[in-house]
Structure formats: C-alpha cells, structure tokens
Swiss-Prot record:
Probable zinc transporter that may mediate zinc remobilization from the endoplasmic reticulum under zinc limitation. The gene is zip2. One of its GO terms (biological process) is intracellular zinc ion homeostasis. This is Probable zinc transporter zip2. Disulfide bonds: none annotated. InterPro entries: ZIP. GO terms for molecular function: zinc ion transmembrane transporter activity.
Length: 389
C-alpha cells in the first residue's frame, strides 16, 4: 500500500498548525497596516474564544458525521457482520475511546495541577521580563514609600506583593487608609510569581511625595478572583499547550487513516481548519505567559511538529501490521480505530476545548462561545454538503 499520500497530507496539515501559531503576530501586522493600535491580542480574550469555540463545533460534527461514518463503511465490509453487529462493535469502540480519553485527560489535569502546586512547572519554565513599555507603565513609588503589611512575613508569592496596610503609616507620619495596597520594590515586580497590585487612589489625608505618582498607576480590583487569575496565567498557558499537543497525536492518526479513503475529504478539511485554530490556541496562552512572541511561536511550532507526525507514525505502523492479515481483519481494525477516535474527538470537543472557551468568554450568557460553536457546526455541515455534490 502506498502511504505517501498519508505522509504528505499529515505534514501539510501540520504546516497549517505552524501557520496558525504565527497568528500571535496578527495584531502587529494589523496595527502596522492601519498605523495605530486597533488590535491587542495580549489583553483580549475574544480571539481565543472565537478560535476555541469554532474548533469545538468543527470537531464535534466531524467526529459524529464523518469519522463515525467512515467507521461504519469499514465494518460493513466484513462478510460475517450484519448491520446490528456493525453498530454494536462501532458504539462499543466509540464509548471505549471516549472513556479512555476522558480518564487520560482527568489524570493529566490532576498531574499538571499537582505540578503547579509543588512548583514543578515554575522550576522548569521561566517567564520573560516585561517589555520596556510595560516596565515604564508600571512605575514603582519613590523609595521613601515603604510597604507595611501584616501578611509580609508569610512568605507566599502573593503576600510578598499584596497586603493590607491596617494601622500603617507613610514616611510623612500620616495614617494611611485601612485596606490600602502598595506595590513592593521593583525586584518583586518582575518576579514570575508576583501579583501586581496598586493603590487605587491617592489617600485624601496625605499630601507627601510618596503619594504623588499614584494617579498614574494601573488599577486592579484586588478581588480574590482577580488575584487568582493573574497568579495562574503562567500555569494555564503551560496546561493549555501540553493538553492540546497531546490531543494532536490522535489527530495525526485520523489524518493518516482518512487519506486512505476517498470519502475522507471532510475530515481532512475540518482538520486543516482546526489545526490553524489549534496552532494559535497553543501559541496564544504561551505568549500571555511569557510575553515573548518568538519564544511562544517556536515552542508551539516545535510541540505541534512533534505531536501530529507522531500520530501519523502510529497509524503507519498499524497499517503495516494490519496489511499482513486478511481484508476482513484490516476492515475491522480500521473500523474500530475510527470509532474509538471519534469518541476521543467528542470528549476533546465537549470536555476540553469548549469549556476552555467558556472560561475565557465574558459575554452575556456566554453568547460569544455558543455563536462561534454553532458557526463551526454549520460551516462543517456546509463543507460536507458541498463535498457530496
């Protein structure tokens, strides 16, 4: 069997993923084109929500309408199987694949969560320093303004930066407002585990020098949710990248197998679009975490270039092993693998990608996510109708 088509398509779709990773440069190109800032990927979740939700819709429809259909076509070719047996084996493989993938995803999340708690991820990855413009905007108070906090001795990452100044005094001797927050010195400001908090406004009862610059500081709400969000941006970026790259292994498997049948066009188109989105989805959280476009792009391109071809290699080895048996055995093997992979795709869509989109969606009733999710399904349906004609 000639497998060159499978390798060409797999590598081509992988190139789409690398192309998608370059999307983190999109705002620079757009802003340069217009001559002023119209797009800021670093401070907007809209692009990420759009990509994730649309990708989830494409995968959901593809898993059920395309991959499961391919599974049925293979299994119905087996002479000893009637339609009932075909459906039994197909749905058993479908649910088995979904359960295995769900368990795998559960333990992966658990391991990553424990790693973030023990500092494993922070010890093995570093965060780039803020850009000069960011550092300029985050000016620290004058040296005369000391930070006094009852939480300072706790030693936790957040308590080194954020604290309540209850009953504290500034150098001028003026009593500060209870609950005011001050930024620690500049060395803590660039720490990878720091949370930036600033005094919201200049205290009305103090006119000393140390409060003269507070009006220019960025402000944060200081709520526990905001602090937790800022503190977990780095870990979230690593988790998202690792999860999606590990999920791309079965995608490479699907792409390679789909290339062997004439009716695989729908899956290939869906996977091509999906990989453009996923390339951006891998690179974007890393860019948010590292604040470095080249580092995020190279990391995303490297991870995707390893994971998808690995799935294709596994499919190639399975096909070579199955080729030595009977045609019924080969059809059974392909049918079971396609059905199991469809179950994995369903869990990937509904359990991993869509919830991630909802988590970043701040629109009313998560409307943005559900609109993009529906568009993904309708777009895939349109491509299938177009392909059938």
């Amino acid at each position: 069997m000639n497998n060159s088509k499978g390798w060409i398509l797999s590598l081509s779709i992988n190139a789409f993923c690398v192309f998608g990773a370059s999307g983190i440069y999109l705002d620079k190109l757009v802003n340069k084109w217009f001559g002023y800032e119209v797009l800021d990927l670093a401070n907007s979740d809209n692009a990420l929500v759009t990509g994730l939700a649309t990708s989830s819709g494409i995968l959901l429809y593809s898993s059920w309408a395309s991959v499961m259909q391919e599974s049925f076509h293979f299994l119905e070719k087996i002479s000893m199987f009637d339609t009932f047996l075909v459906r039994v084996f197909q749905f058993c493989a479908f649910f088995f694949g979904g359960i295995v993938f769900y368990i795998f995803n559960h333990f992966l999340h658990k391991w990553l969560h424990e790693s973030s708690q023990t500092g494993f991820l922070h010890d093995h990855f570093s965060v780039s320093d803020p850009s000069p413009s960011t550092a300029q905007n985050h000016r620290s108070p004058p040296a005369s303004c000391k930070r006094l906090s009852s939480c300072e001795s706790s030693g936790s990452p957040s308590s080194r930066v954020v604290g309540s100044l209850q009953g504290s005094y500034c150098p001028s001797g003026t009593h500060l407002h209870e609950g005011s927050l001050l930024l620690e010195d500049s060395s803590a400001r660039h720490s990878s585990d720091s949370v930036h908090e600033y005094l919201v406004k200049k205290p009305s009862n103090c006119d000393c020098e140390c409060h003269a610059h507070f009006s220019s500081f960025p402000t944060h709400s200081g709520t526990p949710d905001d602090i937790e969000h800022i503190h977990s941006v780095y870990t979230m970026g690593i988790q998202t990248a690792l999860l999606i790259c590990l999920h791309k292994v079965p995608e490479g498997f699907i792409t390679f197998l789909a290339s062997t049948v004439d009716t695989g066009f729908m899956v290939l188109v869906a996977m091509s679009i999906h990989n453009i989105v996923e390339g951006f989805t891998i690179a974007y959280p890393l860019y948010l975490a590292w604040k470095s476009r080249p580092k995020a792009f190279l990391t995303a391109a490297t991870l995707s270039s390893c994971s998808l071809p690995l799935g294709s290699l596994i499919a190639f080895l399975v096909m070579e092993a199955g080729g030595i048996g009977s045609s019924d055995f080969l059809n059974f093997l392909y049918g079971i693998i396609f059905a199991g992979t469809a179950g994995m795709m369903l869990i990937l869509s509904l359990r991993v990608i869509l919830p991630e989109a909802l988590r970043h969606d701040h629109s009313e009733n998560k409307r943005h996510s559900f609109i993009c999710f529906t568009i993904g399904i309708l777009f895939t349906l349109f491509l299938e109708i177009f392909d059938s004609h």
